[in-house]
Amino acid sequence: MTTFLGNPVTFTGKQLQVGDIAKDFLLIATDLSQKSLKDFEGKKKVISVVPSIDTGICSKQTRTFNEELSELDNTVVITVSMDLPFAQKRWCSAEGLDNVILLSDFYDHSFGQEYALLMNEWHLLTRAVLILDEHNKVTYTEYVDNVNSDVDYEAAINAAKILP
């Protein structure tokens, strides 16, 4: 059971499992352009999912994965939240991070629904990490049980680094 602020939450959709092929998504970038998995075709993808970039844990998660993994060959680190693209852009500017890929699911929540990440009670995304290979095959997942806690950074970073 997943909890947020001590209360149980429910999700729509089916959580991704290792071995699944991730379905395409359509998210909004900080420049208001639309982005899909096709935009990152042929690259390994670390998808860091957070409820809101403006919280301490979410900020830490975004910064940690970008600092630890953005230099990996043929790899992109993508952070997805429900924040408006304007707030995401403001956060990047305030944090001095220019190369962070922040995408928003605010428009229709389809990413959260398809990947079983949308907390129905809050209309926010849960905390998770999804790692996909160049062919969008899922190689690692972590959906946290307590949204107010950190992901297992060490496990996720190691999983990303061992991808061939």
UniProtKB/Swiss-Prot annotation:
The active site is at residue 58. It is an enzyme of class 1 (oxidoreductase). Its EC number is 1.11.1.24. This is Thiol peroxidase. CDD domains: PRX_Atyp2cys (cd03014). It comes from Streptococcus agalactiae serotype V (strain ATCC BAA-611 / 2603 V/R). Belongs to the peroxiredoxin family. Tpx subfamily. Keywords: Antioxidant, Disulfide bond, Oxidoreductase, Peroxidase, Redox-active center. GO terms for molecular function: thioredoxin peroxidase activity. NCBIfam families: PRK00522.1. Residues 16-162 form the Thioredoxin domain. The lineage of its organism: Bacteria, Bacillati, Bacillota, Bacilli, Lactobacillales. Thiol-specific peroxidase that catalyzes the reduction of hydrogen peroxide and organic hydroperoxides to water and alcohols, respectively. Plays a role in cell protection against oxidative stress by detoxifying peroxides. Disulfide bonds join 58-92. Homodimer. The active site is a conserved redox-active cysteine residue, the peroxidatic cysteine (C(P)), which makes the nucleophilic attack on the peroxide substrate. The peroxide oxidizes the C(P)-SH to cysteine sulfenic acid (C(P)-SOH), which then reacts with another cysteine residue, the resolving cysteine (C(R)), to form a disulfide bridge. The disulfide is subsequently reduced by an appropriate electron donor to complete the catalytic cycle. In this atypical 2-Cys peroxiredoxin, C(R) is present in the same subunit to form an intramolecular disulfide. SUPFAM superfamilies: Thioredoxin-like (SSF52833). It comes from the Bacteria. It catalyses: a hydroperoxide + [thioredoxin]-dithiol = an alcohol + [thioredoxin]-disulfide + H2O.
